[in-house]
From Swiss-Prot:
Signal peptide positions on this chain: 1-19
Residues covered by region (Complementarity-determining-3): 112-122
Subcellular localization: Secreted; Cell membrane
Biological process according to GO: adaptive immune response; immune response
Region (Framework-3): 76-111
Location of region: Framework-2: 52-68
Source organism: Homo sapiens (Human)
Keywords recorded for this protein, A-Z: Adaptive immunity, Cell membrane, Disulfide bond, Immunity, Immunoglobulin, Immunoglobulin domain, Membrane, Secreted, Signal
Subunit structure: Immunoglobulins are composed of two identical heavy chains and two identical light chains; disulfide-linked.
Gene Ontology terms: cellular component: extracellular region; immunoglobulin complex; plasma membrane
The name this protein goes by in its record: Immunoglobulin lambda variable 4-3
One Pfam family from the record: V-set
Length: 122
């Protein structure tokens, strides 16, 4: 029985002069190979309509864009991201769900605020 570990680190990137949101994530998670796992990124309540972006970072590599997740739960994936990666939303929470976990999914996962509110850049 093999486990896959995930390390979660929120970060913020923004180009506007608006107050910055606070993003929180649990520090780590793990699951069995072949299982599913849901990672959570929580926005501060006053920024609950913001869009976030999920990134995967393996040791010694640059972050790889996975997807954007909007407040309505819709998501758009980066090039080459498999169908087993899904995004969703509930209130101020944005989720990244993996199904059929594979050993190469073990990495750090970052969520970042993309400074998009209801489809408009702020």
């Amino acid at each position: 029985m093999a486990w896959v570990s995930f390390y979660l680190l929120p970060f913020i990137f923004s180009t506007g002069l608006c107050a910055l949101p606070v993003l929180t994530q649990p520090p780590s998670a793990s699951a069995l190979l072949g299982a599913s796992i849901k990672l959570t990124c929580t926005l501060s309540s006053e920024h609950s309509t913001y869009t976030i972006e999920w990134y995967q970072q393996r040791p010694g590599r640059s972050p790889q864009y996975i997807m954007k997740v909007k407040s309505d739960g819709s998501h758009s994936k980066g090039d080459g991201i498999p169908d087993r990666f899904m995004g969703s939303s509930s209130g101020a929470d944005r989720y990244l769900t993996f199904s059929n976990l594979q050993s190469d999914d073990e990495a750090e996962y970052h969520c970042g605020e993309s400074h998009t509110i209801d489809g408009q850049v702020g």
